[in-house]
Amino acid sequence: MSSIPLSSDTIAIMKSVQKYLYQFGCPILMFIGTISCIINLIVFTQKILRKNPCSIYFIAYNVANFIYIYSSLLALTLSVGYSIDASVYNLIICRLRLYTVTLFNILSPFYIILASIDRILITSSNALTRQRSTRRLAYLCIIIGTLFWALFHIHALIASSITQLAPNTFLCYFQPGVHLIFVSYYALIKETSSLSLMIICGLWSIKNIRSMGRVRMIVNTSVSKTTTGGNIQSNSSKDQQLMFMLLMDIIIYASFSFVFVIYLMYQQTTQNYIKNAERIQIETCIRNICLFSAGIPFCTSCYANLIVSKTFRSEAKKAISWKRILCIN
């Protein structure tokens, strides 16, 4: 199928949007994301929250987000916004960059999916199922899952190369051929499956909460005058707020990653089409804009948590208070 003619004005506009987005928008996004990850890590490592298995997943999630920001968004800012790309001059840097980006791009949603499964366990009406939500299981899942994905993406350290596209124009990417086809389909499957699993787990947790609502009210009312009852209410409140924070993360991820999923579907559908240079340039611009959109969920978690969780706001206020920072009693 032949390409549809595209005007030079359209290409110029798209390139300008892409350039200014990464020159000014992405550094701002990185700054916001850095603050978000730091505050999240400070809050979730506080004594009141770190004993909860879901908080352990959130800690891993924010560590992955922080590394992704400085491996992917920083590299995109320099290469797209300022035409600075060290990875096209050194093969080791090229391979390390691709490996880090692909690894932490999957680890962040993976940790969110683990947290979603933990919320399914803790909101189950079955007491034995709820008991499976433990810190030991959280550490085990994080360690095994991280090792699995680290080994799975080892191909990026082996089958990536620097390709010359034109005179003085180089690209650090996966080797053309079977490996590139594999990576293309993997990216599509990864995005669609991550999105689907998050939505399914989120809806499942909501269903569990609704089905347990009446039972929890009866239990809390019957023990409200005892110390144990107060602890049950406190723990239940923390679990609910962690659930709300998780659901907000899922909504944000789904909203901004959906655009990139659509682009990947389009890319696979049109991979055999004959495309002229102008259309390739347009698609490259769209891809970079979609990558910017897909990077937003890695940078906004803290601000969503501040909106939906009273406990998070309280702990954040304590953690960043001047008395605490200056170690004043």
Named regions from a protein language model:
Residues M1-I38:
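Extracellular N-terminal segment of 7TM GPCRs
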Residues C26, M30, I67-I84, N105, ...:
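Helix-to-loop junction signature of class
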Residues L29-G33, A60-S72, C141-H153, E191-L195, ...:
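Alpha-helical transmembrane segments of multi-pass membrane proteins
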Residues I32-T45, I59-N62, S72-L73, T102-A127, ...:
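Cytoplasm-facing ends of alpha-helical transmembrane segments in multi-pass membrane proteins
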